[in-house]
Amino acid sequence: MSAFTPASEVLLRHSDDLEQSRILFAGDLQDDLPARLDTAASRAHTQQFHHWQVLSCQMGDNARFSLVATANDVADCDTLIYYWPKNKPEAQFQLMNLLSLLPVGTDIFVVGENRSGVRSAEQMLADYAPLNKVDSARRCGLYFGRLEKQPVFDADKFWGEYSVDGLTVKTLPGVFSRDGLDVGSQLLLSTLTPHTKGKVLDVGCGAGVLSVAFARHSPKIRLTLCDVSAPAVEASRATLAANGVESEVFASNVFSEVKGCFDMIISNPPFHDGMQTSLDAAQTLIRGAVRHLNSGGELRIVANAFLPYPDVLDETFGFHEVIAQTGRFKVYRAIMTRQAKKG
């Protein structure tokens, strides 16, 4: 998170105009521009724990991580710079939340890559802060407007729900597989053996569907779930509650907040961070798993077949197995033995 993204580079073209502003940065904060831009004052709000980790090191309490921003998070700000995410419902949740808190007259900037659909910000904010495009560069658009009317924000109206084999799944904007169970997770679920026992960690838990499905046929497992995403953490908690499953759920950048060892780690790891392709999380997951597995414990992950995980698995564990595959996905299994490197 050191090099600036194209969106931030577009903003830097206007840095002179922002020096006297008291800015709230929010949305898909992929770099540390909020901590480095010369302003009268800067705050940041993010739903992504790994982004908060980086920003809080430089901004302290002026960087906040939560599902819903509060009045304290936007206090004294006269400008919003919002980085448009790839997910439109996620943008709507965040913008309606923030604009309901900011005072009328607040300057509103929205910036994002053209391929993310940033141009739809104009229609989304038309009734509250009419936007005009003020710059276009690096395949990004920058839009500006002024808040004329605060929207009414009700987080409860953004919840979604679907069923999988009799299980209730609760979801929020920005959560992976928000509209239904994805094919990769289905394949991973098909490999989980009934009547499994022991401690199981679900990394990148999303809406919690893997864990509740596993718990249904293996009720003696002791589950722990984590995700970098605040919406995912809240969705998993709701999914677990709806299905009567008890578990600890918390925000973590892969293993950053995880303590102790487990008998099994399961994951459908992401390979995108915002609009960018990133294998960092999955490689951190594989390499770090050996420090959180009991002897004889296993890592079981599903991934797109083209991703280069076999080499990392072999390098870390000494070997791996492919226990299920389709044309698009593979389920990998690696066992914690004396060969595994705990480096």
Swiss-Prot record:
Catalyses which reaction(s): guanosine(1207) in 16S rRNA + S-adenosyl-L-methionine = N(2)-methylguanosine(1207) in 16S rRNA + S-adenosyl-L-homocysteine + H(+)
TM region(s), chain numbering: none
GO MF term set: 16S rRNA (guanine(1207)-N(2))-methyltransferase activity; nucleic acid binding
UniProt keyword Transferase, yes or no: yes
Domain of life per record: Bacteria
Keywords: Cytoplasm, Methyltransferase, rRNA processing, S-adenosyl-L-methionine, Transferase
GO cellular component: cytoplasm
Record-linked Gene3D superfamilies: Vaccinia Virus protein VP39 (3.40.50.150)
Matching InterPro entries: DNA_methylase_N6_adenine_CS, Mtase_sm_N, rRNA_ssu_MeTfrase_C, RsmC/RlmG, SAM-dependent_MTases_sf, Small_mtfrase_dom
Function: Specifically methylates the guanine in position 1207 of 16S rRNA in the 30S particle.
Record family assignment: Belongs to the methyltransferase superfamily. RsmC family.
Subunit structure of this chain's protein: Monomer.
Protein name (Swiss-Prot/TrEMBL): Ribosomal RNA small subunit methyltransferase C
Organism: Shigella flexneri serotype 5b (strain 8401)
